[in-house]
């Protein structure tokens, strides 16, 4: 079977859930200059064709720097914000205008290669961002550098209803006709909040947030962000992470940080369970809970491959329905990715840990340990003193977690009488 068939099957729930949802996407000026820009545009057009409502916010920092250099002007910054005097503002307007036209042209060109070939794609914009001056901070006059005052929510909403891609530039206008240079990250964050967007997607050079060892941090809650910000200091990665967290605290369901250097990063992040970058969300990504009758189908999908390999004892749907209350499960975005069951043994103070299984894609996240801990807690709550496990393949895993070799003779009579000598499972026990 071709790989794309399986991919499409797994992506179909996401395609459905993303339809008619508002996504605000921020692409910095460095991303527009990168060789992967064409692929990013293609992915955005594809996302639009699948029914997402897109607001694209672009940056322009390197383009402004280039124009300043061409005029022999030195850039000035204070607290990582550009000081925009009158000559600098001319460079900003020139850079932003040229960049906006280039992006619109690329979006129009990419339509021919998209699933919506032959349809009309509209890129819309205008004076949709009202701004105010930052003013004087610590004695430094920022001149024409501003901050977002208001997003024209109704105006953008009408454009999205007309199936336009809304393109916002890092410029804002005041009621008195002034123009202000804005940070694209701030524009994107405020747009996502004011539009009550489903997602804020932030492009950066890195794959996402990297921890101190350089490993990708795939998921974060907003309350976990401050510790990372302290470690990251004044880096651009910290700026992206802070914007992502602020958006979530203000009601945006999910913020994503992905790389503009990696082909297909956006699609991998939005249409796979593992994602491609860093996800920041208020909601719980995974839930460890007790199983209910509605979970039987998901349990069967999880354990069937292990049953076919002979690792787990086969259980029919009827058996699972009858014994569902014995199971604890780990659920991730509607998918059961791990399970374990506790069977108290009659006429004894012992129980059996059974059917411990973890989806192969999630076997290195400590979920087996979490389930074992939950089963032990449940066993203690029932007053059980000993926990038995019978296994044919995973003896070392249990021994590393405190289980000791035992024997069939040590099993309580009610369980020993059911022992399958043909399967010849090893018996281990652990005192609780």
From Swiss-Prot:
It holds the Pfam family AA_kinase. The keyword Membrane does not apply. It is found in: Cytoplasm. Its EC number is 2.3.1.1. It catalyses: L-glutamate + acetyl-CoA = N-acetyl-L-glutamate + CoA + H(+). Belongs to the acetyltransferase family. ArgA subfamily. PANTHER family: AMINO-ACID ACETYLTRANSFERASE, AMINO-ACID ACETYLTRANSFERASE NAGS1, CHLOROPLASTIC-RELATED. This is Amino-acid acetyltransferase.
